[in-house]
């Protein structure tokens, strides 16, 4: 028998400003660190991306036609404040007002993120969120947006605080490209969570209408050998780096003893210290019960083995299967069981991990209120044939994840919506234009859109709520 989803469920599609808009310098937009970083380090740039800056009416019309009733959109901070603070760019304001109006015209509810990996260059180059001044700049920007855009009903402070710390200071695939600095990873996580908490408190104190939450990437971590205490420990430490530290800050308003024990162990082995202040914890504590929802981005799980050597991480950027490597001194190394499928980019396909992660949030953080799956999808080297893509692998991936999501709801989790990554093809931060995720194929030369087989499947799903 087919599984089902609730009648009031959001069947959404996700986007992000820098990955979709293009127009990186148009109409007064300020630079972001990615502009130069992609030029210097990768084989592509954010021009033209999906030209969403001009094509959004087309994309929203397609969304409406294919039953997509929610869209994740992020505001490019540097389109509003080109330097991150100070002078406002009126053309940026006009763009987002027009975009949100089009969403409502098409009956597609916008879920709007304030920061999706794109701190304005002026602030990124002075330390990004490692510089505490930028916490205040972010909160001021957030307050400006809450006032300016009353037409938005769902706000998200940050997209993926974890992968920002990881990408910028551990793997080094995001600007400024620093590697293996675990203290910076945790400090970035912490400072961004303080910024999140201050913005949420301000939103609630200001009496703004609508809801506010945060989007966390939560890849589930398992021990390679569940009977080996050393593997169990490796999975726990890896979970602290990517998930638990951030979830504790979100919903406990502090870091549990067990979390701090793990953090202190990791820093004792790898060096570095954290600056955690009393007033930070006051901010976290004040916001811990104010989050209206948690967005979970879930693509994959990892298995961890105990490991004694030095840290070495190789990022698989070009989809050459088996080329990635991940091992951290004092933590462990990733090694998946042979029978678990992987994508060409070595992303492990394991739907059960989504169920386990949802139930973990429900159990460990009972003040979570409700969950949206804010990103989930399959990156693929799509083959464009007869004006479409026969993306059965993508349909299978999404179907299996929706089935476990249905199980989680049946088992008492409050999950209210799902946003496929991505609505239309966009460029991937560290993989470029070859790795496609969309329901709609984008010809990046002509900017024409073509519905894939998955779009027709998703339309039927949205109409019936039956996962077939």
From Swiss-Prot:
InterPro entries reported in the protein's UniProt record: 6P-beta-galactosidase (IPR005928), Glyco_hydro_1 (IPR001360), Glyco_hydro_1_AS (IPR018120), Glyco_hydro_1_N_CS (IPR033132), Glycoside_hydrolase_SF (IPR017853)
This protein's pathway: Carbohydrate metabolism; lactose degradation; D-galactose 6-phosphate and beta-D-glucose from lactose 6-phosphate: step 1/1
Known catalytic reactions: a 6-phospho-beta-D-galactoside + H2O = D-galactose 6-phosphate + an alcohol
EC number: 3.2.1.85
Keywords: Glycosidase, Hydrolase
Highest taxon of source: Bacteria
GO cellular component, one term: cytosol
Pfam families, sorted: Glyco_hydro_1
GO molecular function: 6-phospho-beta-galactosidase activity; beta-glucosidase activity
Active site annotation, chain numbering: 160, 375
Residues binding D-galactose 6-phosphate, per UniProt: 19, 116, 159-160, 297, 428-429, 435, 437
UniProt GO BP: carbohydrate metabolic process; lactose catabolic process via tagatose-6-phosphate
Family: Belongs to the glycosyl hydrolase 1 family.
Protein name (record): 6-phospho-beta-galactosidase
Organism: Streptococcus mutans serotype c (strain ATCC 700610 / UA159)
């Amino acid at each position: 028998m087919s599984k089902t989803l609730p009648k009031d469920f959001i069947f959404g599609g996700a986007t992000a400003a820098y990955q979709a808009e293009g127009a990186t310098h148009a109409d007064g937009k300020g630079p972001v660190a990615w502009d130069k970083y992609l030029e210097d380090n990768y084989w592509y740039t954010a021009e033209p991306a999906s030209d969403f800056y001009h094509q959004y009416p087309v994309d929203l019309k397609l969304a409406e036609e294919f039953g997509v009733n929610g869209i994740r959109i992020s505001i490019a901070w540097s389109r509003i404040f080109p330097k991150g603070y100070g002078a406002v760019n009126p053309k940026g304001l006009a763009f987002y007002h027009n975009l949100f109006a089009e969403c409502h015209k098409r009956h597609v509810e916008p879920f709007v993120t304030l920061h999706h990996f794109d701190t304005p260059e002026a602030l990124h180059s002075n330390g990004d969120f490692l510089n505490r001044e930028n916490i205040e700049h972010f909160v001021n920007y957030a307050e400006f947006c809450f006032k300016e855009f009353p037409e938005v009903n769902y706000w998200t402070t940050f997209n993926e605080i974890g992968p920002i710390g990881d990408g910028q200071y551990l793997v080094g695939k995001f600007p400024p490209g620093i590697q293996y600095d675990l203290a910076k990873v945790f400090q970035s996580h912490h400072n961004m969570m303080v910024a999140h908490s201050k913005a949420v408190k301000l939103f609630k104190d200001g009496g703004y209408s609508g809801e506010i939450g945060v989007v966390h990437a939560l890849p589930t971590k398992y021990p390679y050998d569940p009977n080996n205490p050393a593997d169990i420990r490796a999975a726990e430490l890896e979970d602290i780096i990517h998930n638990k530290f951030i979830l504790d800050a979100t919903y406990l308003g502090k870091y549990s003893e067990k979390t701090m024990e793990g953090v202190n162990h990791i820093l004792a082995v790898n060096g570095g210290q954290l600056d955690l202040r009393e007033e930070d914890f006051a901010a976290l504590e004040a916001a811990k019960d104010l989050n209206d929802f948690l967005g979970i981005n879930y693509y994959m799980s990892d298995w961890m083995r105990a490991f004694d050597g030095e840290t070495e991480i190789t990022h698989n950027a070009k989809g050459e299967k088996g080329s990635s490597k991940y091992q951290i001194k004092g933590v462990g190394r990733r090694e998946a069981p042979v029978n678990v499928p992987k994508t060409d980019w070595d992303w492990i396909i394991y739907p059960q991990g989504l169920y386990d992660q949802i139930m973990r949030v429900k159990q460990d953080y009972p003040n979570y209120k409700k969950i949206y799956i804010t990103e989930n999808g399959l990156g693929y080297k799509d083959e464009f044939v007869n004006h479409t893509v026969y993306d059965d692998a993508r349909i299978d991936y999404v179907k299996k994840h929706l089935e476990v999501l249905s199980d989680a709801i049946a088992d008492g989790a409050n999950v209210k919506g799902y946003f496929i990554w991505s609505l239309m093809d966009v460029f991937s931060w560290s993989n470029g234009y070859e790795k496609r995720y969309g329901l709609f194929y984008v010809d990046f030369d002509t900017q024409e859109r073509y519905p894939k087989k998955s779009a027709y499947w998703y339309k039927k799903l949205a109409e019936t709520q039956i996962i077939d």
